Amino acid sequence: MIKVFRTSEMYLIAAEAGAHLGGEKLTQGNKYLNDFCKKRYSGYTEKTYPTASQLISQVLLERKREFIGEGMLWSDLRRTHQGFQRESTFDIDEEYNKINNIMFKYGMNLKYDADDYRFVWPIPKDEIDANPQLKGQQNPGY
C-alpha cells in the first residue's frame, strides 16, 4: 500500500521538527506553521510561539483539525506519549442498554493512559505461526 503524503502534512512535520530542534529551527518551525495556517484560514494573522512546547501544542491541534477521520491522531498520541479520555454525552435508553450492554459499557466512555498496552497492536497469531523467530513472543498485555 502506498502512503500518500499531502503538502499540509509535510508543513506540519517540518513545523514540529523545528520546535524539537530549537534555536534558529524554532523560528523556521513558526514560519512553516504560519505558512500552513495562511492557506487554511482567511484573514489569518501570523503568530509566533516563543517556546517549543507552545509550538508543538499548536501543531498537534492543527494536525487534529487537518487529518480528522484519517487515523493520524492515534499515531500522534502514541508518538507524543499522551493518553486520552472520551466520555459519552449521549442520553442512553436504559432498556436498549440492557440489550446492548457491551457497546455502552466498553465503547462509550474510554480512557487510555499514555502507557496503556492498547496503544501497541498485538502481533497476529498467523505471523507468529509463520515466523519461527517470533515463537513465544507477543506485545505486552496480549
What are these regions (language model features)?
Residues M1-Y142:
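Acidic/polar-rich alpha-helix caps and helix-coil junctions
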